[in-house]
Regions:
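Mg2+-dependent prenyl diphosphate-binding active-site environment of isoprenoid biosynthetic enzymes
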Residues: 1-185
């Protein structure tokens, strides 16, 4: 399950913006939190994002992403499905490590639940995106609803969860919620 080139050699690619984990860490810093406490959720968010890209490439039959062949284009559809699914479970396992960096049990459970709710919302957006392919037209409101779910859900989760788990004295929900809403203001 490592990163490999077409010839099977290890990849040293540093591609991608890592926007979601960066937002989580920035939110953690914004609330005066401990960045180590936010690291497991930041890692989880990146794995969820990669899961979504692997499946999106297959669903859209995109053979190239960022000038590189996609997983399914190299290894086949079945391998892409399994790889994407594995990424999602690795994301869950990363989130479970919140406790090992000192996040309280109740906060860790809340963060894991929020992560799941947000990636399910992201999947709803992907479903809408796929369904639009057979529509003669899509309204602006329909598109905005789709993109809010498909892309916005994980961005919202990144900002919210980074702010939620990082404070050493426990979560400041008012600050975390303020961060969560900033993309909507």
């Amino acid at each position: 399950m490592g990163w490999q080139e077409v010839d099977g050699s290890d990849s040293n690619s540093m591609g991608g913006k890592r926007m979601r984990p960066t937002l989580a860490m920035l939110a953690a810093d914004a609330v005066g939190g401990d960045l180590e406490r936010a690291t497991p959720i930041a890692v989880a968010l990146e794995y969820v994002h990669n899961f979504s890209l692997i499946h999106d490439d297959l669903e859209d039959l995109d053979r190239v992403r960022h000038h590189r062949p996609t997983v399914w284009a190299i290894w086949g559809e079945s391998a892409a499905i399994v790889s994407g699914n594995a990424m999602l479970k690795i994301a869950d396992a990363a989130a479970w490590k919140l406790r090992s960096v000192g996040v309280e049990e109740s906060v860790a459970l809340e963060a894991e639940s929020e992560l799941t709710n947000h990636y399910l919302k992201m999947m709803e957006g992907q479903y809408l995106d796929i369904s639009f392919e057979t529509e003669a037209s899509v309204t602006v409101d329909q598109y905005l609803d789709m993109i809010e779910r498909k892309t916005g859900a994980l961005i919202e989760a990144s900002i919210y969860l980074g702010g939620l788990v990082a404070p050493r004295s426990g979560p400041d929900r008012s600050k975390a919620k303020a961060l969560k809403s900033m993309g909507y203001e």
